[in-house]
Amino acid sequence: MAGQRTYREKRPVREGSPAALHPAEFAKDREYVDVLRWHHVGLSSRFLAASDGDLYGIDLVLAGVMVRSYGLVDGFLDAFDTWNPVVAAPLLRMQLDNLVRVSYMVQAPSASDVADHFVVGGEFRNLKDGDGKLLTDARLLHHAKEHHPWVAPVYEATSGWVHFSPTHVQAAMRLHRDEDGRALVDRLFQ
């Protein structure tokens, strides 16, 4: 069994992984995701050191997001390296949950009130935005789209991986064409 790695240790590209087998398409982006993973630590240190070390509700929420995000990126790399989209896609969707919640919090009329509500155990879905609408996932996406126009289609595409759906059935099949161009379906596990 391999020893535990440190949080800043570079994650080598595994033999047989998509980045190893298709380096032109995946190696650079995979390395970038790994760099983003360990940048979480430095970024967290910087924002937690602001305000002369005093901590506020916003700091606690952001620290929680950073720990969750680090774990999601770390897990994504493992799933990607082992060709496991059934795990990788929901992790990406969970990362989008982080994004839409932080995006709303920082643009809310009172970010401190949102953070304080969350720190004591409240949920975003029980809060209302400036228009008096509950902060459902759809509403959070609405607010995030202003700054992240790409978020809605990615959120939608990855949502199919969270709950059992036709996406999983399609992932269990291998689609290809025969020599005459007819579509064929093979089971993944034969």
Question: Can you say where each PLM-predicted feature lies in the sequence?
Answer:
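Charge-enriched, short contiguous segments at helix-coil
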Residues: 161-190
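Intrinsically disordered, low-complexity N-terminal regions enriched in serine/proline/glycine
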Residues: 6, 31, 154, 160-162, ...
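Short non-catalytic regulatory patches outside canonical folded cores
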Residues: 46-60, 77, 81-86, 90-160, ...
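N-terminal, Lys/Arg-enriched amphipathic/low-complexity engagement segments
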Residues: 2, 6-65
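Helix-boundary capping/turn motifs
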Residues: 65-71
